[in-house]
From Swiss-Prot:
This is Putative antitoxin PYRAB11980. Coiled coil: none annotated. The lineage of its organism: Archaea, Methanobacteriati, Methanobacteriota, Thermococci, Thermococcales. Belongs to the UPF0165 family. Keywords: Toxin-antitoxin system. Possibly the antitoxin component of a type II toxin-antitoxin (TA) system. It comes from the Archaea.
Length: 61
């Protein structure tokens, strides 16, 4: 199995790099969309005491 990054344009998946396949070769495409930044941030979030957060917000005003 090979992972190939593609862009979808005009109803066609187009590879972003040159690939070595014979014309007419068939395969299966699995679409995995890039994660949103909010999903990535959830992985690294930590709990903060509410009073510390309030103090931080006050300093920013």
């Amino acid at each position: 199995m090979e992972v190939i990054e593609v862009v979808y344009e005009d109803g066609v998946f187009k590879p972003l790099k040159k690939i070595k396949l014979k014309e007419g070769t068939r395969g299966v495409v699995v679409v995995r969309l890039p994660k949103q930044i909010s999903e990535i941030a959830k992985k690294y979030r930590i709990k903060v005491r509410e009073d510390v957060l309030e103090e931080f917000l006050e300093e920013r005003r």
